[in-house]
Every structure is written in structure tokens, then in C-alpha cells.
Amino acid sequence: MNSTDVTKGFTEQFGKQAEHTFFAPGRINLIGEHTDYNGGHVFPCAISLGTYAAVGTNEDNAFRLYSANFQRLALLTSIFGSFQDKRGLWTDYFQGMARVMKTAGANFTHGLNVYINGNLPDGAGLSSSASLEMLVGTILNSLFDGGFEPLELVQFGVKVENDYIGVNSGVMDQFAIEMGRANQATLLDTNTMKYEYLPVEMGDNVIVIMNTNKRRELADSKYNERRSECEKALAMLQKGIEVKSLGQLSEDEFDENTYLIYDPILIKRARHAVFENQRTLKASKALQDGDLKTFGKLVSASGVSLAFDYEVTGIELDTLVTNALKQRGVLGARMTGAGFGGCAIAIVNSADVEDFIDNVGKTYREKIGYDAHFYVADIADGAKQLN
């Protein structure tokens, strides 16, 4: 899929030529899972799969939206007044961004026809919703001279998720999608929002995305429950030590103060947040140093913690990761994203990718009963206007 596909679709849908094209990628997180709402570090990158849009103006004072993925045409009419309440549809993400940007001072002076199509598997944990949010933010900011900085668009997207969609997500997804750079990952301190770009040099290895094809509904999953558990654990720790977030603690500091947390489940949740943050720092340094063996071990250790301390995997993800680690040429593997379905990643020697996909796919099909899908990820730039 590319911009030509959406410009052709735009003409078929609206009967005229598109004036602009845009793209927003999906994302994978190399390591640093469920740390973004705990004041820790994350290490994501944008990928070449994503969401495209072809856009043209109209004189209807309306946003006419068509999604090729859902094969639905939608009409948002109140671009000069108040928007409708959310309806549990894909249009909520467009409308949510428009509402937040309008509140922040955006001035929508005319209508738009927007044709959207993407190649991110829906519900796969590659951030299709955040990709759509950042796509919309880029479109509206560009075509209405919004003047918003990229980090402002990131915060608008988080606000849409938290206040409009109803998901207590952190900042990582929108940040990675808006701020991504080709062939680089971003080490982001979510506590301070300081970040640095680090080259992803894998040598003879590639990143293989493994899609369980089990949909995960973020708002309906236990994502919000995990965040609440971490907040409870932090509150207990704060009764005995001065700490603002779990991400501020070292492993030793956490181990010395676990007696403050009375619930063994909460200890497990907080331990993941603390230790995952430290793993992320170690992994980013290992990648900088060209120590891919250590990097792979830390990626795999993250997966173990997500399965046993944070308990966000499940039989589908566990089957993929366990069998991935048995294959020749694999440096590391783990789930990526919020969990409860969705995707995992593996770092695989390029010479072994074909056998890897055949073997892991066969075992998955035999155990789960349906196919997993595999993609070799290219690390891409963030959201942008294409023409």
C-alpha cells in the first residue's frame, strides 16, 4: 500500500482529485512495556506499516470521511460548533482530535473530504488508533495552519485516549508515531519527556513482527486495571519513602522497600514497572555499544516479566514467544504493546527468517487452531505530509 492507492480511492469515492496525501506509521516498542504511565523509560520506533490519507477541500462545512478498512462513509457536520459525543466508532478518533485541537485554538475554516486506508492490522497492538490520531492531527495542523508543535499533537492524542475514548494510556504510542525517525529508535523518559534518538543497527538481524491474530480491545482489556494496580503500589511505597513514580526507583531501592506493599499481586506489578525501566536503560546502552547478544537477552527477560509479573500475555502470545526462542538465529523475543493478544517481536538473523516463520507458524497453527501472521519491520519516519 502507498499514497497512490489512497489517491485512487479518493477519486472513486468523491469524484474528484485529492489535493494532499498524508501518512502516519504504526509503532513497535523494542523494550520498556507498561512503563510509560509509571514514569519510566520506553524505547519505541515507528514502522513502515501505517495509515494513509488522501484529502481534498469541500464547501459543505463538513468533514466527509471514508475508511477503506471499514468501508464506511461518515459525516461530521459541526466543524464550526460543538462536536457529537463519541459513538464507539472509528470516527471517534478523528472527531476526538478535532475537538481537542479546536479547544486549543484551531480554526476550521472549510470542510474536508478525507479518504483513509491503512495496512496496520486492527487490534493487533501496533497502535492503529494512535496512528489514526496522529494522522488526523497532522492533517488538521497542516491544512488549517494550526501552528501546533509535534509534542503538542502528541499530548492532544493522549488526551483523546484518556478523556474521550476512555483508555488510561500513557504517552508512548503517540510519541513514537509522531516523532519517529527512519532507522532509529527513541529512548524517551516519560517522567521528564526528555528523549534521544539512537540508531538501530542490527547487523545481519531483522525485527520480525508476529501477529497472534487475536484482537485486543484496549478499553475493554485489563490495561486500566494494571495501571490502577501500579498506582496503588506506588501509594503504599509513598507512605514510607519519597518517590513520585515507580520509574524513579532502582532495583535495589524497590527490593529494600517491598515490605511497604502488603499485597503480593501489587508487588509483582510494581516489580515489573521498576525492573523493566532498568532493563530498558541497559538495553538501549547495549544497542549503542553494538552488543546485540545482551540486547536480545534483555528483550527476552522483558517478555518473562510481562508474562509472570505483569501477567498480560496469554496462550497466544506465550506460544509465539516460547517457540520463537527455540529457533535458530534468534537473539530475543517478547510480546509488544499492551498485551492480552496482539503482537510479539523477535530479533532474527536474516538468513533464518524463512525457516523461523515456517516453524513458528506451524507450531502456532497446531496449538491455537488458526494462523499467525508475520511481517519484517522497517523502521520509518513519523507522521508527515507526503506531497
Curated annotation (Swiss-Prot):
Reaction(s) catalysed by this chain's protein: alpha-D-galactose + ATP = alpha-D-galactose 1-phosphate + ADP + H(+)
UniProt protein name: Galactokinase
GO BP: galactose metabolic process
Pathway listed: Carbohydrate metabolism; galactose metabolism
EC number: 2.7.1.6
Binding site for Mg(2+): S129, E161
Transmembrane segments annotated in the record for this chain: none
GO cellular component, one term: cytosol
PROSITE patterns the record matches: GALACTOKINASE, GHMP_KINASES_ATP
Assigned protein family: Belongs to the GHMP kinase family. GalK subfamily.
Xref: InterPro entries: Galactokinase, Galactokinase_bac, Galactokinase_CS, GalKase_N, GHMP_kinase_C_dom, GHMP_kinase_C_sf, GHMP_kinase_N_dom, GHMP_knse_ATP-bd_CS
SUPFAM superfamilies registered for this protein in UniProt: GHMP Kinase, C-terminal domain, Ribosomal protein S5 domain 2-like
Alphabetical UniProt keywords: ATP-binding, Carbohydrate metabolism, Cytoplasm, Galactose metabolism, Kinase, Magnesium, Metal-binding, Nucleotide-binding, Transferase
Gene behind the chain: galK
Single GO molecular function: magnesium ion binding
Source species of the chain: Lacticaseibacillus casei
Localisation: Cytoplasm
Domain of life: Bacteria
Annotated site location: Transition state stabilizer: R27
Active site location: D173
